[in-house]
Amino acid sequence: MIRKIIISFIAATSLILFSTQAFALLNFSVGVPLSHTMTGNDTAGNEIKSDGVSGYFVQVGVPILPGIGMDSYKTKIKCAACTVELELETSMYNLYYLLPIPIINLTVGVGAGKTKFLCDGSDCSWQDGGTASQWYTSLGFPILPLFDLHLSYRSVSSKIETTTGSDKGKKDDVGGNVMGLGIGFNF
């Protein structure tokens, strides 16, 4: 009798303390980008460097089915020769799948969207923006029965074509990698 009670207690405790999103009816996640490393070059062949990133990631889903998400962030660009503050604005819409693995929450996804340069907060007149695509993964660890803390990695591909001047038709390669940190809620 005591053995059955102990086994039942362990099983109940495991379900309560180590619940994952696979048991939840709805999962909701928010996050922020921590770093954006550019891997491409501008039209002159110079390396594009990030000077900080701000924004958000949001995703919502249900178990077994793919979920949807949205990323929106701005990356300041280091530019010694620029006369204006230059930023890269990225907006993505994502489709993701939460793999049903106990204890950890592993998410894989893809996204599509747009990138554009901003000059002092407005669209730069020398470009119309470009299309962007990404793949990403997120690894979450439960911190409480209904919450998890997750670290994400995004690999973004995008090129922005110059539409005026002597560089017309040339493209800035603004692809790179974005690391993020977030928290997930499971209802």
Language-model region placement:
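Short, flexible helix-coil linker/hinge segments at the edges of structured domains or between repeats
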Residues: 157, 162-173, 180-182
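Gram-negative (and chloroplast) outer-membrane scaffold detector with strong preference
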Residues: 32, 56-143, 147-149, 174-187
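Short acidic, glycine/proline-rich loop/turn micro-motifs
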Residues: 40-44, 80-82, 119-123, 162-165
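Transmembrane beta-strand segments of Gram-negative outer membrane beta-barrel proteins
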Residues: 24-36, 66
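Cleavable N-terminal export/targeting peptides
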Residues: 1-27
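Surface-exposed strand-loop-strand hairpins of Gram-negative outer-membrane beta-barrel proteins
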Residues: 35-56, 125-130, 159, 168-169
